[in-house]
């Protein structure tokens, strides 16, 4: 990462595989082997989306805006002792800590644009959170939506997440668009629900998401690249 006007960029790679598997059967299998906070199956007619996303893009309940940022990943251990050691090593990694704090600050600025600045909080910072196959560093950023802003204003301010684009966000997106040969489609987008009766919203980032179309399954994955990234480590992550 040698470009001076960007701290981080998140390039991704698209994979495809021919399949006769029904997408809903894939969804059922995914629920069993990889349960996640956001499980979804969306039938769009000519394409189907199957997802197991761990990351909240934007959640609004009674005017409280919340972002659940994930940055920093390591595999689960084979034993409880190895699990604990891997989680602690991730938490103490200077590179992962710096990258995580940078993305938390970006999310805080996104939330602050539509919330009362006196209410914006980092409620939790760099929690070690364990999922079925990986360990993540996670943080929660919240704020109270201003009366002159709507839930869609909040969604626009936060989208796309810095964890799948980079920082500064606009410049990182420009860099990624030069590197990736195809448009991302649903990958790194948003899937969720909007409740117009209660004015609530709960939307996740479309990561760990497959698109089924024309008997082909498409999967896309990316990773944050910073100045001191090790290529092999980032690819494995």
Predicted regions and their residues:
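Extended alpha-helical targeting/anchoring segments
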Residues: 1, 5-237
């Amino acid at each position: 990462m040698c470009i001076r006007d960007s701290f981080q960029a998140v390039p991704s790679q698209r994979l495809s595989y021919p399949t006769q598997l029904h997408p809903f059967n894939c969804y059922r299998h995914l629920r069993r082997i990889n349960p996640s906070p956001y499980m979804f199956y969306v039938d769009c007619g000519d394409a189907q989306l199957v997802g197991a996303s761990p990351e909240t893009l934007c959640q609004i309940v009674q005017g409280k805006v919340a972002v659940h940022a994930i940055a920093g990943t390591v595999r689960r251990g084979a034993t409880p002792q190895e699990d604990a050691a891997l989680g602690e090593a991730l938490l103490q990694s200077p590179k992962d800590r710096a990258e995580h704090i940078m993305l938390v600050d970006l999310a805080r600025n996104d939330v602050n644009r539509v919330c009362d600045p006196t209410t914006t909080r980092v409620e939790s910072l760099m929690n070690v959170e364990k999922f079925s196959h990986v360990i993540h560093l996670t943080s929660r950023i919240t704020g109270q939506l201003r009366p002159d802003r709507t839930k869609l204003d909040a969604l626009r301010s936060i989208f796309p997440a810095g964890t799948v684009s980079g920082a500064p966000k606009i410049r990182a997106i420009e860099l990624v668009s030069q590197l990736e040969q195809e448009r991302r489609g649903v990958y790194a987008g948003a899937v969720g629900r909007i409740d117009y009766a209660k004015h609530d919203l709960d939307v996740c980032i479309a990561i760990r998401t497959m698109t089924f179309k024309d008997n082909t399954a498409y999967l896309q994955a990316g990773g944050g690249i910073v100045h001191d990234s090790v290529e092999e480590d980032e690819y494995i992550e």
